[in-house]
Amino acid sequence: RTPWHMWDVKTCLPPKGADTYEAIRLCEYAIGLAGQHDEEQNPAILHLHIHLLEMSTEPERAMDSADRLGGLCPDAGHIQHMPGHIYVLCGEYEKAKTASEAAILVNRKYLSYAGPYNYYTTARCHDLHLMMYTCMLLGQFEPAMAAAEEICENLPPDVIDLKDKPFIAGTMEGYFAMRMHVLVRFGKWQEIIDSPMPERPDLYCLTTSMHHYAKTIAFAALKQFDKADQEKEAFYASLRCISPNRKLFNNPALQILGVGEKMLLGELEYHKGNYDIAFAHLRESVQRCDDLHYSEPWPWMHPPRHALGALLLEQGHYEEAEEVYRADLGLNDTVPRCGQHKNNVWAL
């Protein structure tokens, strides 16, 4: 009975014991009642309606709620952000970007009022995280990178190092690590190579792993295989420093990095010319990504199907590449609805 347990995304049905259908009926009754009486909508109802439907097979059913919600609480960053949940799922990335920009502006006002040493810092990072994600799917490097940099600016060691709040600390460090996704997504190989490693790998443990992941791919793309292999080994060594109990959003951190492991291996073998081995790794990365629990946005921000499809296409495997892209776009219903990336520029 929490937002992430209202649907089983594999069966497309509510799990046993969930009051999903009843909750949807109640929300839609309240929304309809306000409409009949020409009254302003209740933002809490619209907020819940979005959460109820984002994991369903028809998130567009909450599109009207998303459109109505944004302006109802202009100084509430989370409410400004919430429409983006639906917009991203429906491929309305420019609208998701606009919602995220509004939320980020409001959150800066709250930061100036309350400072960074509070739980709301995680919410501010969440809104920036969605901004990164939607701009990546739009193919817009500069705003995606700006959001990533703002996350890092918001999370110096004294904000992350909350020994009495390990879950919050772990969540915030996970946000910090996301910067590398943007650089890999846009092929910024030299910027990745030039990025310094974290000074405190004990505190920035996910970030350390993500740096080694990105540097492996960067060196592989530049055909510097000795350095790529060194970074690969450093990546595996860094994983041993992450507790099996460490979670990032709704998934174990090591499970999320397992997606990256197979992407890393796939890219490395591809650039070495071992295409069959590379494609096997990338297909496994796709499967691992599909097996993650839903989180908004997804914790692995670079859909493996995009890498697999592009490299298949480059080697002339046109039919499989088409199927991979069609799955990503939601055109063949092989991927659960909330795992599809409608209208994204990388698969179109």
Indicate residue ranges for each PLM-predicted region.
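Residue at a conserved register position within TPR or TPR-like alpha-solenoid repeats
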Residues: 52-53, 87, 135, 183, ...
